[in-house]
C-alpha cells in the first residue's frame, strides 16, 4: 500500500465529546517522606496539556487540518487553561460551561520521566443534551468529518441524534467508544475500540480469526460502516462488511508512554478521511502516527512533519534518490537523532574505483552522506560536447546503490551553492589538492558554523581519462 501525505489544510473536522485537562507536576525525588514510606517530589515545573476530546482536536490541528471542538467544562481556572492552549493551537473551541461543577483534570506527578501518581478531579457532568446538540448542528455544514470522543464523563448523551444528523448530510461519523453498550454508536461510519473495550462487548477472542468473526457480527448488529480494533503491540485490525480483514503491525520503534495513543489514532483517521483518503490508507496513516506518539512522554500530539517523515521511511525514501523537499525532511529527521550530515558533489559520469574510495572517505566524516549530482545540461556545460556519457537518472541510480551513500539529489546549476543554502550540511567535503578557500560553497558552510574538508584524490582515477581512452580505442 503506497502512502502519501494528505492535503490536511482542506479537511475540516468537528470533535464533540468529553474535554479534560491533563496536568503534569514535574520534579525530582531524592528522599523518602518521614511521615510515610512514599517518595517526596520537589515540584519544579507545572505543565498543562489538553486531554480527552481536546487532545483529539489538538492532534487534528497539529496535522494542519481545521479543527473545531464542542464540549463541556466548569467555569474555572482549568477551563481557561484549556481555552488558551487550544486557541494557541488554532482549535476553534465552543464550551458549555457549568458554573457549579469543576472541569475534569487528570493530575500526574512525574519524576525522572516516570509517572508516580495520578489524581483525578472530576464529577459526571449534568448537561443539557439539547443545548450541546444545537451547537453541533450549527457547525455541521462546514465540516467533512464528525468525531465523537466519548470518555463516559457525561458530555455525550445523545449519540444517536448526532449520528443521524451527520448521516443526513453525508458526513462520516467516527466514534472512539466507551462503556459496555456500543448500541449508542449504531449507524456510525467507524468506531475505534481498543482490544479491551472490544472484548468487553463481544467476549474474549482466542485468536485473530475469532476477533474477525465477532467483529463482523458486531458490525452487522450495529449497522457500522467499519470497525477498527487497536491492539497495542499487535498493531490494529480493520474490519469492513464483505471485505477481507486488514491487519497492520505496530510501527512503534520504542514505546515510552501510551497516554493519548487512541486520541492520535482517531484524530489522524478523521483528518485523513476528511482529506479524501480511502479508509485503508487512512488507517495506515493512523498506525504510523500512533507509532510515533507512544514514543513521547505524556499526552502528546503528532505534527505534520513527523507524519511526513514516517511516510518517507515507510515508502523506503529514508535512503536513495530524493527531491529537495524529501531531502530536507530526511535531513531534519537525521538531525533529530543527533546525526552529522556530510555533503559532496560532482558529475560522477562514469563511476570508477576512485569515486567509490572517495565517497567512503567522505561518509567517514559523519553519519549521513548526501551526494549532489550535476544534471545533464550542467555536465555538458562543464565538460563539453558529448558529455555526459550516462544520463543523470542512471548516474544517480548507481550512486544510490553504494553503501556509503545515503541520499542522492540532482541540481541544474554548475555549482551547488543553492543546495548548500537549503540543506546546511555539517560538513562539506571535496576531493582535490587545493585549499579550503578554493572549495565552491565553503563560504556558505563556514558562515553558519559548518566545516569544510578537502580529501585527497585516488591516483590514476579520472573519468575524463577513461572517456578519452574509450574514444581512442573506438
UniProtKB/Swiss-Prot annotation:
Which reaction is the catalytic activity of this chain? D-glycero-beta-D-manno-heptose 7-phosphate + ATP = D-glycero-beta-D-manno-heptose 1,7-bisphosphate + ADP + H(+); D-glycero-beta-D-manno-heptose 1-phosphate + ATP + H(+) = ADP-D-glycero-beta-D-manno-heptose + diphosphate
For region Cytidylyltransferase, the annotated ranges are 343-474
| Tagged with keyword ATP-binding | yes
Per UniProt, what is one Pfam family of this protein?
PfkB
Q: Which SUPFAM superfamilies match?
A: Nucleotidylyl transferase, Ribokinase-like
Please list the residues that make up the active site. Answer: 263
Does the keyword section mention Nucleotide-binding?
Answer: yes
* Lineage per the UniProt record: Bacteria, Pseudomonadati, Pseudomonadota, Gammaproteobacteria, Pseudomonadales
Q: What is its EC number?
A: 2.7.1.167, 2.7.7.70
Q: How does it assemble?
A: Homodimer.
Briefly, what is this protein's role? Catalyzes the ADP transfer from ATP to D-glycero-beta-D-manno-heptose 1-phosphate, yielding ADP-D-glycero-beta-D-manno-heptose.
* HAMAP family per the UniProt record, alphabetical: HldE
What are the GO MF terms of this UniProt record? ATP binding; heptose 7-phosphate kinase activity; heptose-1-phosphate adenylyltransferase activity; phosphotransferase activity, alcohol group as acceptor
Q: What is this protein called?
A: Bifunctional protein HldE
Instruction: State the similarity comment.
Output: In the N-terminal section; belongs to the carbohydrate kinase PfkB family. In the C-terminal section; belongs to the cytidylyltransferase family.
Per the UniProt entry, what are the Gene Ontology biological process annotations, in alphabetical order? ADP-L-glycero-beta-D-manno-heptose biosynthetic process
Q: In which pathway does it act?
A: Nucleotide-sugar biosynthesis; ADP-L-glycero-beta-D-manno-heptose biosynthesis; ADP-L-glycero-beta-D-manno-heptose from D-glycero-beta-D-manno-heptose 7-phosphate: step 1/4; Nucleotide-sugar biosynthesis; ADP-L-glycero-beta-D-manno-heptose biosynthesis; ADP-L-glycero-beta-D-manno-heptose from D-glycero-beta-D-manno-heptose 7-phosphate: step 3/4
Q: Cellular component per GO?
A: cytosol
Q: What class of enzyme is it?
A: transferase
Keywords in alphabetical order = ATP-binding, Carbohydrate metabolism, Kinase, Multifunctional enzyme, Nucleotide-binding, Nucleotidyltransferase, Transferase
